[in-house]
């Protein structure tokens, strides 16, 4: 069981205990007072829970975030006085800038998401944190270096205060878009969620998707399909998405590859490298039907077996063919999804068997262990650094600013992804309605799926390491 599954299991157990205690309290209240009072309070208590206590937050918001940025990143003297941020550092304006500062929620910040506004004249960014936040947080100032150097950048807390002496961390700019890039996507849409802005602006980009993403096809079962048939249809659609959607960004289909391995089976493959791991739901043990859109043959096409050794052979062939200078893939500790962990492990293992080696790793996190809402806040906001409560590894932050047209193009790319199109369940829509009017949370203008809010932002955030 993964750490996230353990945290979720504990969260649900505590929630059941809290629900039982609440029901007992209402029952006692009905006995000692008016019998109808619990019936009146029950829907109000449920609405309050959905509005303010339904987030999957598996840590205390009073804890400090902790980061080590490594040798590429330097600290610069900075000060915050009457909301004006100042530094003596000489900035070119294109660096990745991270401000470490203590954020303390006010009493309203326990019911409305606290946020920090970054003000440069009429230009406004805002970055949002957990309700009740009271600890060190890391603001992303990338793209605001000019305003900071000119002494125009102001910070203002909404439903929170900024305390203590800030620390400014500067990572020098590295021109990523002029180098050959390969984005490793465990599933169709991972490349777009994490790196659409990067790969759409790169001179030469490859998008390699590892799995067909065929499971959890209930939406297609509603069309009258059996479970296995629905899974096969979903896999075919997502395989098509992985080849077709990057074309919207200008990536030719000759550099888009779908490997067709089965969703959530990469850990099983890794555990027994020469043993096939069939699909959980599609009643298939041959990956070739999901690879038929590929522009050229790959080693695993010979037998179509979903094995770890075949995956490594496919990756080695692609790496030797593309010779990427930059590899973009899931972060090994921040992103807990089993397929994401195995994807980065497979790439690193494949690199050991070939002569060509990339110069730079860029890692992303589309999921977190302990906060399902990160990046917090609304579409179009900046992306503050995610919660990390222990700094075990040193990675340099690397943030790419996205202008509004690029954000809109990214939203359209996500909208083309079939897995992000089905409507949300009624309970989730009702929860969002309550949160909108009781907690001030705004829906994304681009789409109903939560990833439109999370991914269509002012920044794309990566973690960089030179090899």
Question: Where do the model's predicted regions map?
Answer:
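Active-site rim/loop-helix segments in enzyme catalytic domains that contact anionic ligands
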Residues: 2-321, 344-356, 363-367, 392-396, ...
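Short His-Asn-centered micro-motif
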Residues: 184-187, 330-331, 338
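Active-site rim elements
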Residues: 228-232, 331-337, 394-403
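Proline-aspartate-enriched helix->loop->beta-strand connector
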Residues: 315-333, 340
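Lipid deacylating catalytic domains
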Residues: 332, 401-404, 459-466
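Short, catalytically relevant binding-site loops at active-site mouths
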Residues: 333-335, 368-371
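PAPS-dependent sulfotransferase catalytic core
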Residues: 370-405
């Amino acid at each position: 069981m993964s750490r996230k599954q353990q945290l979720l299991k504990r969260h649900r157990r505590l929630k059941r205990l809290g629900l039982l205690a609440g029901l007992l309290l209402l029952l006692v209240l009905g006995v000692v007072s008016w019998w109808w009072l619990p019936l009146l309070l029950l829907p109000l208590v449920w609405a309050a829970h959905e509005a303010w206590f339904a987030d999957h937050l598996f840590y205390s918001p009073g804890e400090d975030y902790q980061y080590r940025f490594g040798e590429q990143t330097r600290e610069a003297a900075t000060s915050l006085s009457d909301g004006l941020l100042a530094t003596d550092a000489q900035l070119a304006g294109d660096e990745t800038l991270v401000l470490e500062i203590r954020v303390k929620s006010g009493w309203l910040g326990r019911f409305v998401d606290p946020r920090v506004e970054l003000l440069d004249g009429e230009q406004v960014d805002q970055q949002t944190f957990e309700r009740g936040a009271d600890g060190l947080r890391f603001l992303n100032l990338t793209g605001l270096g000019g305003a900071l150097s000119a002494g125009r950048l102001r910070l203002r807390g909404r439903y929170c205060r900024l305390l203590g002496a800030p620390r400014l961390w500067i990572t020098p700019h590295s021109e990523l878009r002029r180098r050959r890039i390969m984005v490793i996507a465990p599933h169709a849409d991972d490349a777009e969620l994490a790196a659409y802005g990067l790969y759409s602006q790169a001179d030469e980009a490859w998008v390699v998707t590892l799995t067909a993403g065929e499971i959890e096809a209930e939406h297609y079962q509603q069309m009258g399909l059996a479970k296995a048939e629905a899974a096969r249809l979903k896999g075919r659609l997502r395989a098509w998405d992985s080849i077709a959607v990057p074309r919207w960004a200008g990536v030719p289909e000759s550099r888009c590859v779908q490997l067709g391995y089965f969703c959530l089976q990469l850990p099983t493959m890794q555990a027994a490298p020469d043993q096939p791991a069939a699909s959980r739901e599609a009643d298939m043990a041959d990956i070739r039907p999901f690879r038929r859109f590929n522009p050229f043959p790959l080693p695993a096409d010979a037998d179509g077996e979903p094995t770890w050794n075949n995956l490594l052979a496919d990756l080695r062939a692609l790496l030797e063919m593309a010779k990427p200078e930059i590899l973009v893939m899931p972060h090994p500790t921040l992103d807990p999804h089993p397929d994401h962990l195995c994807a980065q492990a497979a790439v690193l293992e494949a690199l050991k068997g070939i002569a060509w080696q990339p110069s730079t790793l860029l890692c992303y996190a589309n999921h977190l262990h302990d906060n399902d809402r990160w990046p917090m806040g609304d579409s179009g906001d900046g992306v503050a650094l995610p919660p990390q409560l222990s700094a075990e590894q040193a990675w340099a932050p690397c943030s790419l600013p996205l202008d509004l047209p690029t954000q809109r193009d990214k939203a359209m790319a996500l909208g083309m992804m079939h897995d992000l199109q089905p409507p949300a369940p009624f309970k989730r829509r009702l929860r969002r309605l309550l949160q909108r009017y009781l907690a001030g949370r705004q829906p994304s203008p681009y789409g109903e799926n939560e990833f439109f809010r999370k991914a269509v932002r002012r920044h794309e955030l990566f973690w960089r390491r030179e090899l």
